[in-house]
Every structure is written in C-alpha cells, then in structure tokens.
From Swiss-Prot:
Belongs to the bacterial ribosomal protein bL20 family. This is Large ribosomal subunit protein bL20. One of its GO terms (cellular component) is ribosome. The keyword RNA-binding applies. InterPro entries: Ribosomal_bL20 (IPR005813), RIBOSOMAL_L20_CS (IPR049946), Ribosomal_protein_bL20_C (IPR035566). One of its GO terms (molecular function) is rRNA binding. Keywords: Ribonucleoprotein, Ribosomal protein, RNA-binding, rRNA-binding. Gene3D superfamilies: 6.10.160.10, Ribosomal protein L20 (1.10.1900.20). Binds directly to 23S ribosomal RNA and is necessary for the in vitro assembly process of the 50S ribosomal subunit. It is not involved in the protein synthesizing functions of that subunit. Disulfide bonds: none annotated. GO terms for biological process: ribosomal large subunit assembly; translation.
Length: 116
C-alpha cells in the first residue's frame, strides 16, 4: 500500500483551528494544542448559549410584563389568561416592548383584556 503523506491536510486542519483562535491571548492563539482546546470549549459555549439566549429573553419579557401588569392591579398569569380569553394574539416580546416603550398602549391592552 502506498504511503500517505498528510502535510497539506494536517496544515489545513491546524490553520483552520488557529484562524478560529485569532484574537485569543498568548499560546491560546499560537499553539495548536491549546488553541484547539479553547476553540472547542468556545464552540461548545456558543452552541449552548444560543439556546440559553432564547430562554433568557423569554424570562426577561415575562418579568417586564409582570412588573407592568402589576401597576394596573393584575398579575402576569391573570393578564395572560385574560388575553387568551379576549383572543388578543400578542406574543410576550410584543407585550414587553409595549410595556417598556409605550405605556398608554399597554394600558389599553390591559383594559381590553379586562373588559372581556
């Protein structure tokens, strides 16, 4: 069987990892082994946190809606139940935006939900 020399393949693999490690400090951007470790960890963290970000934003929206709803004498769960009953289809992101940026509109939404 013929001998396979891995020069080009190995160099490409290492360059790819070192390119991903650009901007890291000291050996983390210069040495392949340490760069490989920190890049793998960074990619794992990025993958996990892309999913976590969705949870975190939902928690933030719920906290904002709850705080705004309590100013009008309603809890978050009461408000969401009333909105569902009134068939008002605003998602949590929209409600949080209204609560923060347009309080009168949020008050109108609460009054509409409360009326039904």
């Amino acid at each position: 069987m013929a001998r396979v020399k891995r020069g080009n393949v190995a160099r490409k693999r290492r360059k790819k990892i070192l390119k991903l490690a650009k901007g890291y400090r000291a050996g983390h951007s210069k040495l392949f082994r340490t760069a490989n470790q920190v890049v793998m960890k960074a990619l794992c963290n990025a993958y996990r946190d892309r999913r976590r970000r969705k949870r975190d934003f939902r928690r933030l929206w719920i906290a904002r809606i709850n705080a705004a709803a309590r100013q009008y004498g309603m809890s978050y769960s009461q408000l969401m139940g009333a909105l569902k009953k009134a068939d008002i289809q605003l998602n949590r992101k929209m409600l949080a935006q209204l609560a923060v940026l347009d309080a009168p509109a949020f008050a109108t939404v609460i009054q509409t939900a409360r009326a039904l």
